[in-house]
Regions:
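Basic, Lys/Arg- and aromatic-enriched nucleic-acid-binding interface segment
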Residues: 10-16, 20-24, 39-40, 46-105, ...
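Catalytic-site neighborhood detector that most strongly recognizes the C-terminal catalytic loop/helix
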Residues: 129-131, 255, 274-285
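Short, conserved phosphate-binding/catalytic loop or strand-edge motifs used
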Residues: 1-6, 50-53, 257
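Generic recognition of well-ordered alpha-helical segments
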Residues: 24, 28, 155, 159, ...
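Short, basic (Lys/Arg/His-rich) helix/loop patches that form interaction surfaces
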Residues: 8, 12, 82-91, 101, ...
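A short, basic/aromatic helix-end/turn motif that makes direct DNA contacts
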Residues: 110-116, 271-277, 285
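N-terminal core-binding DNA-recognition domain of tyrosine site-specific recombinases/integrases
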Residues: 1-32, 38, 223-229, 246-251
């Protein structure tokens, strides 16, 4: 998504993911301004449709398609966390979960505290959060393969999750009635059912058809850390943190996979942990 100025200069384009994430942030901002804030009467973004740009393909190239994603060393991971502690603390917990459990970005954001068993050190992955451009909503749906899976984790992530829970309880006390709670709404369209995500603070009336859900990855005010804002955080890292020029959230999943395989885990076991449809996908990471 780039272009050429009238004077002939070519502007560097933005990636598709960047455009969609930026659009999602605008959608949410304007929607919030309409309701509950009532600052404007309508959402101007509801009339915006993003253009699709066809990817150019060299039909006669002999080159094989390569992902090119490299695993992150533990030293670089620790450097990333230190950077985020200063620049973007809400992004830390989802990145830690993905690094130690190999979840996709939507699965990470979709985790609830009910999905986590700290005593047995395992988590259940059964939902994912994504932005639906057609509906202009964040929706809660199934995982990519539409299957429930269980992932074990160790002492490090256990302590991280316990600390996060304590911090969230502390934030709830500090924010008081301004602390946000998260909800989903069941929507029926023709023969389909989907679930929209919403968040409201304690001063706002909760509609009767909203059901509360206790997500794990929260912002300080209690609202959900969404995949779109996580994507923006990762792009910021790739631009500003030395050595992370090609960083993206999915790289954490690659790292988790690489660590398991290099430590002798059976490919079939890793496949099940990751929720891949076949073992060849796992081995190509």
């Amino acid at each position: 998504f780039g272009g050429e100025f009238p004077d002939g200069k070519v502007r560097k384009g933005y990636s598709k993911d960047y455009i969609h994430s930026f659009s999602a942030v605008l959608q949410q901002s304007f929607r919030f301004a309409v309701f509950p804030k009532q600052l404007i009467s309508f959402n101007p973004m509801q009339y915006i449709k993003l253009k699709k740009q066809a990817e150019e393909v060299d039909l006669f190239s002999d080159d094989e398609v390569e992902d090119g994603t490299q695993p992150i060393s533990h030293e670089d991971y620790e450097r990333l966390i230190k950077y985020l502690e200063k620049k973007n603390p809400p992004a830390i917990l989802p990145i830690q979960i993905a690094y130690y459990a190999g979840l996709r970005i939507g699965e990470t954001c979709g985790l609830t505290w009910q999905d986590i068993n700290l005593e047995d050190q395992c988590l259940t992955i059964k939902r994912s959060i994504r932005y639906d451009g057609a509906k202009h909503k964040n929706v809660i749906g199934t995982t990519k393969r539409k299957k429930v899976r269980i992932v074990d984790f160790g002492d490090t992530l256990t302590e991280i999750l316990k600390a996060a829970r304590r911090e969230q309880l502390k934030s709830r006390m500090q924010y008081g009635e301004l602390y946000h709670r998260n909800y989903y709404k069941e929507v029926h369209v023709k023969n389909r059912v989907y679930y929209e995500y919403y968040h409201l603070d304690g001063t706002q009336e909760v509609p009767a058809d909203y059901k509360e859900i206790s997500f794990v990855c929260l912002r300080p005010d209690g609202s959900l850390e969404l995949p779109s804002t996580l994507g923006i955080a990762c792009r910021s890292v790739s631009k500003k943190l030395e050595g992370f020029e090609d960083f993206h959230f999915h790289q954490l999943r690659h790292t988790y996979t690489s660590n398991l395989l290099s430590n002798g885990a059976a490919p079939k076991d890793v496949q099940e942990l990751l929720g891949h449809s076949d073992v060849s996908t796992t081995m190509n990471i």
